[in-house]
Amino acid sequence: MLERNFKSKQKEDFEKMGWIFIQLVADSGVPMGFPDTLCLSPTGYACYVEWKKSKDAKKQPLQRYWNKKLNSMGHDAFFVYPENVEEWRRELISKPRTISH
């Protein structure tokens, strides 16, 4: 499966549950290697995703850097590919976050 088709399917499924997926583009002030997508849940949870076409797809050094940096700051950042997508989906759907005002 092509990465864009895989990513589109996840986006479509999550948007049906009220999520917002924002595509981050490196040439718009987003640093090189920063995750592809910001995922916002309807309950206030947010995470970053770097989509990969397979578990063996190369992760660039800056992608690894940003994934580690974001996680160390308390944000959730993931490398997601077809082989781990179900685990990722379960983790996101189970997040017990609620909206705070």
Language model segments and positions:
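Catalytic phosphate/metal-binding cores of nucleic-acid and nucleotide-processing enzymes, i.e., regions
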Residues: M1-H101
